[in-house]
A protein has these predicted regions:
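Short secondary-structure boundary/hinge segments and terminal tails
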Residues: 71, 147, 194-195, 224-225, ...
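ACP-dependent fatty acid/polyketide chain-elongation machinery
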Residues: 7, 11-110, 118, 127-130, ...
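Active-site-proximal gating segment of KS-fold condensing enzymes and close homologs
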Residues: 81-84, 108-116, 139-141, 146-189, ...
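4′-phosphopantetheine-dependent carrier domains
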Residues: 1-30, 34-40, 44-48, 97, ...
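Glycine-/small-residue-rich "gating" segment that lines the acyl/pantetheine channel
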Residues: 62-68, 170-177, 181, 201-205, ...
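Hydrophobic (often cysteine-bearing) scaffold residues that line and stabilize catalytic clefts
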Residues: 114-121, 196
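Short, glycine/acidic-rich hinge or "gate" loops at secondary-structure transitions
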Residues: 67-71, 120, 137-144
Length: 260
């Protein structure tokens, strides 16, 4: 989920009982989330995601054919061989190949080489901007920082011999900064499952220490290559039945899920 974060000074709006010589603890300054956007499996936006949560909808399914044919490398955990996986489930977003490059001043040729994670985070970043009530022009006087948690950049494996195919984690954040003409920090972080939370933490710190006056923080994770499942099966991280049972006695692994 992408969120715009803005520091709000409240000292002039409320009375605080303290001694005259008491120092002001800037770490207690309030930071507000003023815009939000998100895409997930079976949810094109935050509203649909909330609806699914309220209704207990299970959005995990077998790997769709549009990604790859899981049956070509599927086995059981007991009989697993190199190049095989015992997991065939995940939470998958639809239409990850749909992208309007000209809106972002990107040529069609360049867009083909962009990792879907980069494309979709760019789209959700702009949606967050709209939700917050800002326009790119209104950010000119702000020090906008962009912080994104991202991992599993495997799109380039489909064109490893093509120099025009591929992406770096940094470009996921940098492209947003470039499009919005942002002048604050622009960085990508990979701390595995905590990547998005880490980016939010860094965004808050950047605001509090004055590096940014406003920040966009979030994460993106989209599974596009079977190599991820091969690794998760080899290391035993993947669930054997497509169910996550966090801290449960029957839990035996996790299920990958798309999101931005």
């Amino acid at each position: 989920i992408d969120g715009f974060i803005k520091q709000i000074s409240t000292h002039s709006k409320m009375h605080i009982d303290r001694k005259e010589d008491s120092p002001v603890d800037s770490s207690k300054d309030y930071i507000a989330i003023i815009g939000m956007s998100g895409r997930f499996a079976d949810a094109r936006n935050i509203e649909e995601f909330y609806y699914n949560l309220r209704n207990g909808k299970d959005s995990v399914r077998e790997i769709p054919k549009e990604r790859w044919d899981w049956s070509e490398c599927f086995s059981t955990k007991e009989n697993l061989k190199p190049g095989e996986t015992y997991s065939r489930w995940g939470g998958y977003m639809d239409d990850i190949d749909k992208f309007d490059p000209l809106f972002f001043n990107i040529s069609n040729q360049e867009a083909k080489g962009l990792d879907p994670q980069e494309r979709i985070f760019l789209e959700t970043a702009v949606e967050t901007l709209e939700d917050s009530g800002y326009t790119p022009k209104s950010l000119d006087k702000e020090k906008l920082g962009v912080f994104v948690g991202v991992m599993w950049g495997q799109y380039q494996l489909y064109g490893a011999d093509d120099a025009e195919t591929g992406s770096s984690y940094a470009s996921v954040a940098n492209r947003v900064s470039y499009f919005l003409n942002a002048h604050g920090p622009s960085l990508a972080v990979d701390t595995m499952c905590s990547s998005s939370l880490t980016s939010l933490h860094l965004a808050c710190k950047s605001i509090l220490n004055g590096e940014s006056s406003i920040a966009l923080a979030g994460g993106v994770n989209i599974t596009v290559h079977p190599n991820k499942y091969l690794y998760l099966s080899k290391t035993g991280f993947a669930s054997t039945d497509g169910k996550c049972r966090s801290f449960g006695i029957d839990g035996d692994g996790y299920v990958p899920g798309d999101g931005s």
